[in-house]
Amino acid sequence: MTIEVDVETTIGRPPDEVFAALVDVERYPAWLIASGIVRVEAVDPGPLRAGSGLRIHQTVAGRSTVLDGQVTVLEPGAAFGLRGKDREGVSVRIDAVIALDDMATRLRWSLRIGLPLRYRMFESMVAPQARRAAALDLEAFKRRLESARG
């Protein structure tokens, strides 16, 4: 079973700035707070590209895990995606799509969480928490970017 979360927001910054912040994965812990992201490491040297490896450290509801991840999409100024899976089979997929919206940027954040059979009994508890966390994290991302006006 897959938990699906889709959140959209408008950010008062140009698309290139929003995209730059989305691909700055090592800063994810600064705004993916509700999702419990504590560290993200690029595994491969050099700039991120589709296929780049990531190691994502997360603590949620007292459960710490490391997801082995990969950048799935990297289209400058338009889309960024990643996926990861932990040792117990929990998988996560994030797809972010941005578009110019008047003088701002429209961001669509899609999250998919796949739970292995042994965790499916918790799905009804995890789904609303995941929705709330995504909304809070996207709001933190928006505030962070909009407060950086210079």
Report the location of each language-model feature.
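Hydrophobic ligand-binding cavity/cleft-lining segments
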Residues: 1-43
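Short, surface-exposed coil-to-beta transition loops
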Residues: 4-6, 64-68, 90-95
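Generic structural detector for well-ordered beta-strands
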Residues: 8-12, 70, 97
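Generic recognition of short, well-ordered alpha-helical interface segments
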Residues: 13, 23, 49, 66, ...
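Glycine-rich portal/gate segments that line the openings of hydrophobic small-molecule binding cavities
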Residues: 39-87, 101, 106, 139-150
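Beta-strand/loop substructures that line and gate deep hydrophobic ligand-binding cavities in soluble
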Residues: 83-136
